[in-house]
Amino acid sequence: MKLVNSLAEVTSAVKQCITNEMVENGLLNDVETFIPSYRLDEPMELPGIWLFEHPTIESDKKGSLSNLIYLKTPFEFVCIVYDEDLEQSEILGKNLAARVGHTILKNKNLITDDGRRIFNNVKFRTLYPAGEVQIDGKTNKTPATSIVLEIEYFVDWLKCNKI
């Protein structure tokens, strides 16, 4: 995979995994909003998922040739589900986060046009309460739950061309 294309390709594939399941009978068919970036001004209908991409670093794996490098990028999915009962809202948020994890694993074998898998590996990193979100028109804040998944992939430095 070319370096200049790989970072965008991996991010695009992660987004595609989510949107593939936001259909009737999909794992995320109840999700109203998917925000695939750091946009803070985006209106959100709930249930919702907000994607944050963390810094990409070198993976622990080593390439078999000097021009191959394995990278890993953590992706954080903040999941928010509103319920009048805050405890129920937290439970539903954890359920949505678990379904996001299932979605990425279910769709991780996405194939590129040239027949390669985009993800070499997907690792669970953490599931945690991510604070609270104020929802317009609601008096109570809603709990948010984050799941962090780490995507591993390789790039070939010799194929680093201008896009």
Task: Kindly label every feature range from the protein language model.
Residues 1-66, 107-119, 161-163:
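Small/polar-rich, solvent-exposed N-terminal microdomains that initiate assembly or binding
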Residues 20-26, 45-50, 94-154:
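Acidic-leaning, charged glycine-interspersed low-complexity segments
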Residues 32-34, 55, 78, 85, ...:
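Intrinsically disordered, low-complexity regions of eukaryotic proteins
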Residues 66-70, 80-108:
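Extracellular/virion structural assembly segments
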Residues 67-84, 141-155:
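Oligomerization/assembly interface segments of phage tail-like spikes and tubes
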Residues 88-89, 158-163:
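Short, charged, solvent-exposed linker or helix-capping segments at domain edges/interfaces
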